[in-house]
Design a protein with these regions (language model features):
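Acidic, serine/threonine-rich low-complexity regulatory regions at protein termini
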Residues: 1-133, 137-310
Length: 310
């Protein structure tokens, strides 16, 4: 099964398919709060009752745990996937989770599982979407109270694979990871960086947008999640003409100079015309009022940067 059809407009969108499923079944409403929404900011990021020591202990644990799940440059080993194919599949994962109103952690978790698996396994072209489906299923079970059913996945993915194929591949992927699939992602680091530095709501939301867009580009796959998170916050601060202060250094553990290269990579991904073909769902998310209309704000065209020597 090819993945090209994902580029084309379907007669019915994923959101509409999910609505049909919800109408057909008694679906329990999810109680999870989207961690890249302004409501999450109000309940956690701006919560000054979270102690500095707790925040730092959590970050130390994340860094230690994250070292075990670093992703190398796997592109030379993947003979059947192009950068645009990966962008399409990652966007499909995002669009599906967004349609289900699942927390953003599930999206980051799924994409990292996808990349970790591809790092060590050469996958045929007709199996690439199956891997994305399986990692999506695993993340939905791990990060959400209600997981996506296999039968639902078959429907919203145009019946690309039989249920038996999905179940068998899910078992294979879990066994490959030895069922050890609990790890921090870039969004976890961003939460704690933002909380520890008293980040304002708009800057936090802009950082989330930058970080989510970065997932579409392969260029940042092998960059540490803590660096990606800190660089997205730095980029948002620069756009807002704010500074990377001593507090940011103490909380994140990074000097501005440590993040500059990654920040410009983030900027390049967001400006990439090819990647922008596959990010409609992310842009729609940040047009919503709950997300401060980030994408429709008057200064949004300025939300990328140009090097002085460009």
């Amino acid at each position: 099964m090819d993945i090209e059809y994902l580029e084309e407009e379907s007669d019915i969108s994923i959101c509409e398919k999910v609505e049909i499923i919800s109408d057909q079944e008694s679906v329990e409403e999810s109680i999870e709060m989207d961690t890249t929404s302004s409501m999450f900011y109000d309940s956690f990021i701006s919560d000054t009752s979270v102690s500095d020591s707790y925040n730092q202990d959590t970050l130390n644990y994340y860094r230690l745990r994250g070292e075990k799940f670093m992703i190398g440059d796997y592109w030379p080993n993947q003979k059947h996937m192009t950068p645009s194919m990966r962008s399409i599949l990652v966007h499909w994962i995002f669009e599906t989770f967004d349609a289900y109103d699942f927390p953003t952690e599930a999206f980051f978790h799924s994409v990292k599982l996808f990349d970790l698996y591809l790092e060590k396994n050469c996958v045929e072209k007709n199996q690439l979407q199956l891997i994305s489906i399986v990692t999506l299923l695993i993340a939905s079970k791990f990060d959400n109270r209600r997981n996506i059913l296999t039968s639902e996945i078959s429907y919203i993915s145009h019946n690309a694979y039989k249920m038996e194929e999905v179940i068998m591949k899910e078992r294979e992927v879990l066994e490959y990871f030895n069922f050890d699939i609990s790890f921090p992602t870039a969004i976890h680091f961003l939460h704690h960086f933002a909380n520890g530095t008293f980040c304002d709501k708009y800057t936090y939301m802009l950082s989330c947008y930058i970080l989510e867009m970065s997932m579409l580009g392969y260029e940042l796959v092998s960059v540490k999640d803590s660096i990606k998170a800190a660089a997205s916050l730095l980029m948002a601060l620069k756009i807002k003409q704010l500074e990377w202060t001593e507090l940011h250094i103490n909380v994140s553990g990074y000097e501005e100079a440590d993040l500059t290269i990654t920040m410009w990579k983030l900027n390049a991904v967001i400006k990439n015309k090819s990647i922008n073909r596959y990010c409609s769902a992310i842009k729609e998310k940040y047009k919503k009022r709950i997300n401060l209309n980030i994408f429709e704000s008057e200064d949004f065209p300025k939300n990328t940067m140009t090097k002085e020597n460009d």
